[in-house]
Amino acid sequence: MTEQPDVSRRRIVQLFAGLPLLPLAGGSAAAALLSACGGGNDSAAPATRLMAVTFTGMAAPTLADPAKMATTTVGSGMNATYSDGKTQPYALAYQTFFITGAQVPNGSGGTTLSGGYYDINNRPIMDNSGSSPRQFFSDCPDGTSLLKLDAPTVAGVKGNTVFAVVQFEYTSANLKGDSMYGMLPSPIAVLTLDQDKTTGALTLVKYHNVDTSAANGLWITCGASRSPWNTHLSSEEYEPDATAIATDSQFAGFSRSLYGDATRANPYHYGHMPEITVNPDGTGSCKKHYCMGRISHELVQVMPDERTALMGDDATNGGLFMFIADKARDLSSGTLYVARWQQTSVANGGAATLQWIKLGQASSAEIKALADTLKAADILDVRTTDPADASFTRIPFSGRSNWIRIKPGMEKAAAFLETHRYAALAGGSMGFTKMEGTTVNTRDKIAYTAISAIGSAMTNGSGGIAIKGPSAGAVYALNLKDGQKDTGGAAIDSAWVPVDMAAVPALLSEDLATPDALGNTANADKVANPDNIKFSEKLRTLFIGEDSGTHVNNFLWGYNVDTKVLTRLLSTPSGAESTGLHAVDDMNGFAYVMSNFQHAGDWSSTLHAKVRTTLDPLIRANYRDRYGAAVGYLTGFPLLG
């Protein structure tokens, strides 16, 4: 069956139901839950505090029950221990807002297409490849933020008004079956949600597609985070190579979809950091920050100082980048750095101390002006074979060698518009592969970053890194310190600078020499190909979503950083990737874990050989013939008996 939300059957009490008993909740929610759980005495509510949380895991689904492999499956639970010594078990479940392609309320009495695509003039982009035209919609929802505003004005909300910002990375195929990857401008939507004041249940009231035309549209929006100042920080990964744009058919297709002209889009307008501001009426606005480096932006994590941003770079021969804004809560100007990996271990995912190279200081406005006017040939000369000219420098770039030479006076343009190449030239360690999500454990001053796959660039030394794997990736911990200097000896104006990097032992994948009985090529009881990661301060839990080419089903995990226990919480449909992860400790007294998936049934001929025949018809029935995907969240159901 499909995962359409059914409000009439919804009996959610809340996600992680113990959390409203925290002092942050108070009020009717805490009282109602104490009564429901047998407490009975409302006056006792403020004295009862959540002390600890542990999760109970679920087994990975198998072909013994194919239906569970073909949908989002949750068989996990939570035990909450309170200050009165009592422990309460809760089961977890998954609830959707919609399956993309559904008509959803537009807030004006009508409906609109969820996940729908629009051109630069906000006209629907139509798929004319099938027997009848239809508007394109995405099967790849990704980064999600949950937030609230002080004075919302959306009509029709009976409880608390909560907003979610959801971005859609790409669409896999048109009706004919041809790949559409990267050939459509990524949409972003603001969802207005009605939060039940007693149970915390969320109901979709309004869907609004954000106008991104002022930012020249968006390119392959992947992970996202919520800023400390309550905005949605988006992403644009796999920036188009401006030096080879004339032969880039993907970018030409993108330009044609966006502008109706295959040559109009400017590659230097993409690969930046978009920021979405939500308005009280449930609409939103978009601007791009051009001063944070033009890289394969997967996700940025802003530190508690509200100035320092650590950035995931989902690339081959990518780097670890840090941006320090000139002003708090303002990413429109600042200083860009790249890390140098000083290796201390090759085993178990490797380890290193980190040095920081300053690439430059700039404002978004000045780099935008350069992007508007410059071509690649104005900034640098690039060769893909050795020119036998000493004025060129060999660097690693996207899995191969480039020989580059910066044009006189173009260092700043190169630093912010050709960031990968310039960072390599400056001595940055450009050997990372598939650096994905980034998050922060504020109490311990530890950042975490996910390396989804340890590829050849991390093992062959081409980018200054030479470790032994495992190929299915790992989550790394980075200690954050004050008082650091860059490689030029200048003080770095931040107390949140990563000084070292090492894989977390419990979050190191395990490659299998021989596939298991289901076809997994990495141990299914360990994290493999980690992608989305988010840390919950109150739960002391690092949530990890997989983008795995080694697990038949991808999983969402919870890792307690104090007890070092890893627990499987959720399984996505086979062939799908776990996306949209966002852990929210307190939204009007309730906690939530947002979770989407994308491209269900994206079959690999080898990985899914044993399951495809059985699961493909089930997934097609569940998810609009594989054109749809779920946007939703993990919920908690109290066990009252």
What are these regions (language model features)?
Residues A45-G641:
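Conserved small-residue
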Residues G38-G40:
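Bacterial signal peptide processing site
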Residues M1-S35:
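N-terminal secretory signal peptides
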